[in-house]
Design a protein with these regions (language model features):
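Patatin-like phospholipase
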Residues: 1-25, 33-307
């Protein structure tokens, strides 16, 4: 569904509206993080169209996709999808998730290192006489566009807003869907998809200093305000139910209202498993066509910004 966000960004760029701050959750953290280091809609469009997203997000072993059941290097696969491993790693979390997410982490690292801005460089020195590596602890406020991403600490049941750290790891934590991906551990924190707690972080980007906020909301269902007790949230079933039903509708609805412009592409019939190239192309087109419907509002915001 994130491809639709790229389509909207294309229109924002076309009208020449500058972006000074970015905050994202889940797939929005990946798009936002890449955008913050120099990727633009054209490169993101290509990336969405050319990646094998099913393999990328599921750690699928493509060489085994035609095998019903296969073992390779200590891991068992069904049609190429990893289902269990005989290898035990003491530093690997073992709760609420089937997929480690190693492949997406590796690709995020690669995309960041090769960012158009050249912000991250693997060499020992750069043009300025200093260099950063993508795995270093990075101050997100010093990126070409200041950036924040949101994750959910399942131990404390609270929001975590990343302001610094390994950007690829933080992006990976923000998209760790409960029940699908292993959580990311940082110290005592067990981190999952930020959509569990704040799926439209308008308040986060406001706190960064943004005066005018454009929110791209991929959610397709509007709900009444609903609070969920801690008892409901304990365990994997509770977390999954919490993710599906949205944790704090008062906050979500408040963030919708707080946005200066809310763009909500119509994505009924699409979901997080819409990985095919045809579906991706359709969502890119939907995002762009939706963005064009808001062209006059975007131009008005540009006028306000430039005054």
């Amino acid at each position: 569904m994130g491809a639709a966000e790229v389509g909207v960004l294309k229109v924002i760029e076309e009208v020449g509206l500058p972006i000074d701050y970015i905050a994202g959750t889940s797939i929005g953290s990946i798009i936002g993080g890449l955008y913050s280091v120099g990727y633009r809609s054209a490169q993101l469009d290509t990336l969405f169209r050319t990646q094998e997203w099913l393999s990328l997000l599921t750690d699928r072993e493509d060489s085994l996709k035609n095998s019903i059941f296969e073992e390779k290097d200590g891991t068992y696969y069904v049609f190429g999808f990893p289902i269990s491993s005989s290898k035990k790693k003491t530093n690997e979390p073992g709760k609420f998730g089937a997929l480690k997410g190693d492949r997406i982490t590796d690709y995020l690292h690669r995309w960041l290192v090769n960012s158009p801005s050249g912000y991250f460089r693997s060499s020992s020195t750069g043009a300025s006489g200093s260099a950063l590596h993508v795995s270093d602890s990075t101050d997100f406020s010093r990126l070409p566009i200041p950036f924040r991403c949101v994750a959910f600490d399942a131990k404390k049941m609270k929001e975590v807003v990343f302001t610094h750290g390994s950007i690829s790891t933080c992006m990976r934590a923000s998209m760790a869907i409960p029940g699908a991906f292993k959580p990311v551990r940082m110290g005592e924190q067990m981190l999952y998809d930020g959509g569990c707690i704040n799926n439209l972080p308008v308040d986060v980007v406001r706190a960064m200093g943004a005066d005018i906020v454009i929110a791209i909301d991929l959610n397709q269902t509007q709900h009444e305000n609903r609070d969920i007790s801690l008892e409901e949230m304990f365990g994997i079933t509770g977390i999954l139910d919490w993710l599906v039903s949205r944790p704090d509708w008062k906050r979500y609805n408040a963030n919708r209202e707080a946005a200066d412009l809310l763009i909500n592409p119509p994505l009924e019939g699409y979901d997080v498993l819409s990985f095919s190239k045809a579906k991706v192309a359709e969502m890119l087109k939907i995002g762009e066509s939706t963005g064009r419907k808001f062209r006059s509002q975007l131009l008005e915001i540009k006028k306000r910004v430039m005054e």
